[in-house]
Regions:
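Domain-level recognition of soluble alpha/beta enzyme cores
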Residues: 121-144, 148-155
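Generic beta-sheet signal
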Residues: 5, 50, 99-106
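Active-site-proximal alpha-helix that buttresses catalytic centers in soluble enzyme cores
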Residues: 2-80, 122-125
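Alpha-helix N-cap/helix-start capping motif
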Residues: 11, 57-61, 108-109, 127, ...
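Short alpha-helix plus adjacent loop in nuclease-associated cores
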Residues: 81-94
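Function-determining surface determinants
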Residues: 165-446
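Active-site histidine-anchored catalytic micro-motif
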Residues: 105, 113, 129-130
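Short, solvent-exposed aromatic-acidic interface loops
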Residues: 146-170
Length: 446
């Protein structure tokens, strides 16, 4: 004989598909999985022997499976009456039920009507909500009378034991968005790495590879307080290795771009041998980079890092409670405030300070690139501001690196015939730095 009837409305589901095949959203699944062990723990020992009846609709079946997992129960019974909202059929089935605790997983408004009929008052059964009703009847009423109430008897004989509203899916929707951002970053890096291995001679390819690499590194850094510590330890070394291995190649490409600009402006002659000398230096560096990044150990480490991005290992606290939008937005806002403080009064003559500031600006750029939809239009508007600041800082960084390369190459046998052209490049870059310093803005938040 049923003593306790538990009514469960299915969790938040997808929209737009055929009704029977609508699934729970991933956020809906996560919200139920995180909350149901505690909620169904309210049943105490009685929950261990509970029977679970469910509507055949997929969203209800998925909810019932999460209930079963929370109770460590086996087997579900499908009852069409719960989907058809067939009260006489359900009443007949209840009269023959044997379990002392029976759980019904179904839909609104039907479950709400069942609860109201048994209790005499309306219950707010939100999606994922659970209520437990003592259906043994009040003093002087037989058990059978309780089920007859469902057929129209007005006197309510059930007693509400407890009601828990459906859990909010917002923290899990945020987590889903972060999962998607991580997967998008992983796909970008995977594709960029494959393209680099196929076409290492193309400067645009190496630039795209480094952009994807830096993006995944900075996204991992941004999420690091939310991730399992081991996941961060797996990813960071390979990102650092690959960025370090490709840095000089990118610097040579930047120098090559400067030489091309100076030839176009006429500051360097069209027949300058500096072009071929730089190309030779790039070929040597490209071969070194290709050899380093094609090693099996490096590829295996990258694969592990990508796997961590495709399936992020969130911390136990995140898996338990999800992530609020405020967790993400406040962290981003703190980044902006930190960068504004650094840019105000920045010493543009200090290579280390400019380089560090540019890295922080690019961190914001990459976070906006991956999370702009989540962060909203107001924060997304900083994208152009960051790009403008990045352009100025990059101009200075590239010029400073070009000057450093000139100092290195002017004593090299490979550049012995182009020292005068190297001097032209160096002088041009010094003038460029001075111009940027004279015209720069000091704060991004003005």
């Amino acid at each position: 004989m049923v003593k306790t009837l538990v009514l469960v409305r299915h969790g938040v589901s997808e929209r737009g598909s055929e009704d029977m095949s609508r699934e729970l959203t991933r956020a809906g699944q996560r919200a139920l999985s995180a909350n149901y062990p505690h909620i169904f723990g309210l049943l105490g020992p009685e929950g261990e022997e509970a029977e679970i009846w469910t509507s055949p609709a997929l969203r209800a079946l998925e909810t019932a499976e999460i209930v079963a997992e929370a109770l460590d129960a086996e087997g579900l019974e499908i009852h069409d009456s719960l989907y058809d909202q067939d009260l006489p059929a359900l009443q007949a089935e209840l009269e023959h039920a044997d379990a002392e605790t029976l759980i019904l997983v179904g839909h609104a408004p039907f479950l709400g009507y069942v609860a109201e009929t048994l209790l005499g008052f309306e219950l707010p059964l939100t999606k994922g909500a659970v209520c437990a009703i003592d259906v043994r009847g009040s003093l002087g009423h037989q058990h059978e009378c309780v089920w007859k109430q469902l057929g129209g008897v007005r006197e309510p004989h059930g007693k509400l034991l407890w009601l828990v509203s459906g859990p909010s899916t917002q923290p899990w929707e945020t987590l889903d968005a972060l999962d998607e951002a991580c997967a998008h970053a992983a796909t970008n890096l995977e594709d960029a790495y494959a393209e680099f291995r196929a076409h290492p001679e193309d400067p645009a390819v190496i630039s795209a590879f480094r952009f994807a690499l830096r993006g995944t590194q900075l996204l991992t850094k941004f999420f690091s307080p939310l991730l399992n510590e081991e996941a961060v330890k797996i990813a960071e070394p390979v990102y650092r290795l690959m960025l370090g291995a490709t840095t000089r190649l990118r610097e040579i490409d930047g120098f090559s771009d400067t030489v091309a600009d100076l030839m176009e402006s006429g500051e360097l002659s069209q027949g300058s041998k500096l072009v071929s000398a730089v190309e030779a230096a790039r070929e040597n560096e490209r071969d070194r980079v290709c050899e380093a990044l094609r090693k099996k150990a490096v590829r295996r480490s990258l694969r592990c890092a990508l796997d961590e991005l495709f399936e992020p290992a969130w911390s136990d606290a995140v898996l338990k409670d999800g992530i609020s939008f405020e967790d993400v937005s406040s962290r981003f806002d703190y980044m902006l405030e930190t960068i504004d403080a650094r840019l105000f009064g920045l010493d543009m003559t200090s290579f280390s300070e400019v380089h560090h500031a540019r890295r922080e600006v690019r961190e914001v750029e990459h976070i906006l690139f991956h999370l702009s939809d989540m962060l909203g239009e107001k924060r997304a508007n900083y994208t152009q501001i960051m790009q403008d600041i990045d352009s100025e800082l990059s101009t200075v960084c590239t010029a400073q690196r070009n000057i450093s390369l000139v100092k290195e190459w002017k004593d090299s046998m490979d550049f012995r015939d182009v020292t005068s052209d190297l001097a032209i490049v160096s002088e041009h870059e010094k003038v460029l730095i001075e111009r940027v310093i004279e015209g720069r803005e000091t704060s991004i938040l003005r």
